[in-house]
Curated annotation (Swiss-Prot):
Glycan attachment points: N105
Stated role: Probable non-functional open reading frame (ORF) of V region of the variable domain of T cell receptor (TR) gamma chain. Non-functional ORF generally cannot participate in the synthesis of a productive T cell receptor (TR) chain due to altered V-(D)-J or switch recombination and/or splicing site (at mRNA level) and/or conserved amino acid change (protein level).
Lineage top rank: taxon: Eukaryota
Disulphide connectivity of cysteines: C41-C112
Ig-like domain: residues covered: 21-117
Places the protein is found: Cell membrane
UniProt protein name: Probable non-functional T cell receptor gamma variable
């Protein structure tokens, strides 16, 4: 039996240069286990900033999943993150977090944040 998986999304910005412009389009997504999901964050003018994605699950501290390093044009996974599970990329002023092969434990709040390093 396949279970439906709810992925709740929230978008916050720790003190950053563009915090007033940081907006998330999607507030909630529900997907079946084994499927994929994409979360979009609007970040105008963020092409030279580090883009970070976090997961916050109930009763746990927020966990940084990955970040995009603009000077090397690469995605850096944090320690302990399974390669291929998450990816990020941009289209104009939008940054997307892609989640693959969803499981029940992927439920939580996903945050995008920007830093200048």
């Amino acid at each position: 039996m396949r279970w439906a998986l709810a992925v709740l999304l929230a978008f916050l910005s720790p003190a950053s240069q563009i915090s007033s412009n940081l907006e998330g389009r999607t507030k909630s997504v529900t997907r079946l286990t084994g499927s994929s999901a994409e979360i979009t964050c609007d970040l105008p003018g963020a092409s030279t900033l580090y883009i970070h994605w976090y997961l916050h699950q109930e009763g746990k501290a927020p966990q940084c999943l990955l970040y995009y390093e603009p000077y090397y044009s690469r995605v850096v996974l944090e320690s302990g993150i399974t390669p291929g599970k998450y990816d990020t990329g941009s289209t104009r002023s939008n940054w997307n977090l892609r989640l693959q092969n969803l499981i029940k434990n992927d439920s939580g709040f996903y945050y995008c944040a920007t830093w200048d390093r």
